[in-house]
Design a protein with these regions (language model features):
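ATP-dependent small-molecule kinase phosphotransfer cores
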Residues: 28-86, 90-98, 129, 134-135
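Conserved lysine of the Walker
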Residues: 15
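Short, well-ordered beta-strand core segments
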Residues: 29, 108-109, 158-161
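Conserved phosphate-donor/acceptor-positioning beta-strand/loop module used by diverse small-molecule
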Residues: 88-89, 102-127
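Small-molecule kinase domains that catalyze NTP-dependent phosphoryl transfer to phosphate-bearing small molecules
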Residues: 66, 124-179
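Hydrophobic positions on the alpha1 helix immediately C-terminal to the Walker A/P-loop
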Residues: 18
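P-loop (Walker A) phosphate-binding loop of NTP-binding proteins
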Residues: 10, 22
Length: 180
């Protein structure tokens, strides 16, 4: 039976690194964040943390915190028929419930957990969209308070702690993927 796994965690925890390991093993990636960037382009907004946050929140401001799951549900369904699917940037509890209701036990959540000081340090030095400590803290608060991010993290089926080396983390992610 094919699987759908959403990789969740706070910004800077290592979600993208984990998702890359799924892709290397033939999983189809569906990136919810793509909808944010498409909308930003439509609005003529520069890609930066402030505009990303405003756009994410605007898309959900209609009162539909499950909007990203609804946007991508047809692609998830089609991809699932063909093979395994990994979802990146599923944030909200509403998104989780929509996907869980549709796919049941075929859907799981993998949470990448990293201590906040380690995440903030990594975010300062990452090459793609680095964040200051202030911006990182602001994003944490915004995602927890405004987009229900804690739900999927709290109910995850499996957790991987990413406080150590890249090598150790990748090994644990690979072991998890291979167990599926």
């Amino acid at each position: 039976m094919n699987k759908i796994i959403a990789v969740v965690g706070m910004c800077g925890s290592g979600k993208s690194v984990a998702v890359d390991e799924f892709i290397k093993r033939g999983w189809k990636k569906i990136y919810f964040g793509e909808a944010t960037f498409i909308k930003m382009k439509e609005l003529g907004l520069e890609i930066n943390e402030e505009n990303e946050r405003k756009t994410r929140e605007m898309l959900r401001a209609s009162g539909d915190k499950g909007i990203y799951a609804k946007i991508f549900l047809p692609e998830i369904e089609e991809s699932y028929k063909k093979g395994n699917v990994v979802i990146e940037s599923m944030y909200s509890w509403s998104e989780y419930k929509i996907i869980k209701e549709k796919f049941g036990d075929a859907f799981e959540v993998l949470c990448i957990a990293t201590d906040a000081p380690i995440r903030r340090e990594r975010l300062k030095t990452r090459t793609h969209r680095p964040l200051t400590e202030e911006a990182s803290t602001s994003r944490d608060y915004s995602e927890i308070e405004n987009i229900e991010k804690g739900g999927p993290i709290g109910i995850a089926d499996h957790y991987i702690l990413n406080n150590g080396t890249m090598e150790t983390f990748q090994k644990e992610v690979i072991e998890y993927i291979e167990s599926k």
